[in-house]
Amino acid sequence: MAAASQSMQDSEFRLLSFDAVAKKAESHGSAVDVWRLHAADWRPVLARYAGVPLAELTLAVGPHGKPSLAAPSSPDFNLSHCGDIVLLAIARGVEIGVDVEVLRPRPRALQLAQRYFSADEAAALAALPEAECQQAFYRLWTAKEAVLKALGRGLAFGLDRVGFRLEAGGTAVLPQDFAHAAAPASAWMLHALAPSPGYLGALAWRGESRPIRRFALSP
């Protein structure tokens, strides 16, 4: 695979994307098998950034299932897979979360928002035209997932417990109310992602703004 330099500054992020199309062909389209096959791609990358031989790369699992590198002083990482894209985010000194979703029609987006999002978020979506509502729904969803993953929590924690504000006709999502999270919304940074046509995603972390260096890796 094309290798990204493992020399990473403490003040930056690395966002690496893998093309899952070839893996899908190998696995006959099974999402689970695609995920397992990609371990052969992202484990060597993590080993380089952690500064350990691949054979010594050890993962630990947090109380709510978030994986991390077990070696002391290792960078934090997070992984997301949807459709033909796998994203691997790596950073030092902060806990991060990343999510990516395929933009597919979701006729019940507003009903889902009314059930699982905050009342303010659902009302903001309802005020948008249908096309804008669909995209804004995915922006909110990926932002929420990225924050929950950075916290090391799953969807069961509650999508409504991390609240966002829609701006610019639903094209921008800003942290608003994280009353039930480990830090207030003002402590969080959110970076919107569009890794490929037809996809939206988000990268979330607590702390100062950092530059994000992106790499596209292929077998």
Residue locations for each model-derived region?
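Core catalytic alpha/beta fold that binds nucleotide/phospho-ligands
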Residues: M1-P219
